[in-house]
Amino acid sequence: MSSRIKPHKVFELYQDDRGRRLYTKSITPGKIFFAEKILREKKEEYREIDPTHSKLAAAVVKGATNIGIRKGDVVLYLGASHGYTISFVSDIVGKEGLIFGIDPAPRVMRDLVFLSQERTNVVPILADANHPEQYDHRICGVDIVYQDIAQRNQAEIFIENCNLFLKAGGYGLLSVKARSIDVKKKSKQIFEEVRKKIEAKFTVIDYRILEPFEKDHCMIIVKK
């Protein structure tokens, strides 16, 4: 019988035999965290990642082939929220990797703490990404900075955190929400303005508009 799942061209991701769905190989088989669909094959468990709920998945579906994240990486995740995408990044980096999840909201941090009890490579930190001095003593240099923050100064937050924590040669992924920056300008104009700010500091290696999965969003991927 042919396999129902095969490696995706993006490292540590998988797809079904029709190439329509994205999966990660679970590091906590038997545990379901977000009512995600599960595919079991050859004693392995694969979790489906929904591009309408994850901007990382949306970027991959829209054609991003180098998201930079590898097994064993240390990740600084800004805007952790309830931990949906973090749970899949946790699969990607594996038990050898580590994720520092930053969020200022106590309610969502509670959910992230529950997630970290099962996924020990996730470290929840209640802090504001606008103020890295709140957590700079708790984290180390990282291989990846991933940011999903809906604030007007999201580009500046990303640049500051990359300057402080991202290792040379590391990758940054910035999810840009245009409407949080300006409600009057066209989204594409805002995307280009943010991209120019980022290009002044880092090498942009990919840029994807995330519609139809996420309206008024794009993903900018950089290398330091």
Task: Show which residues each predicted segment covers.
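Helix-to-beta-strand junctions that scaffold the AdoMet/dcAdoMet cofactor pocket
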Residues: R70, V93-G94, F165-G169
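C-terminal substrate-binding/active-site "lid" region of AdoMet-derived donor-dependent transferases
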Residues: S2-I5, V108-D111, I159-K223
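Conserved SAM-binding loop of SAM-dependent methyltransferases across substrates and taxa
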Residues: S81-K95
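Conserved alpha-helix/loop element of class I SAM-dependent methyltransferases that forms part
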Residues: H8, P29, F33-F34, D50-V74
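S-adenosyl-L-methionine
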Residues: F100-Q154
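Residue-level signature of catalytic and energy-coupling elements of molecular machines
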Residues: V60, G79, V145, V222
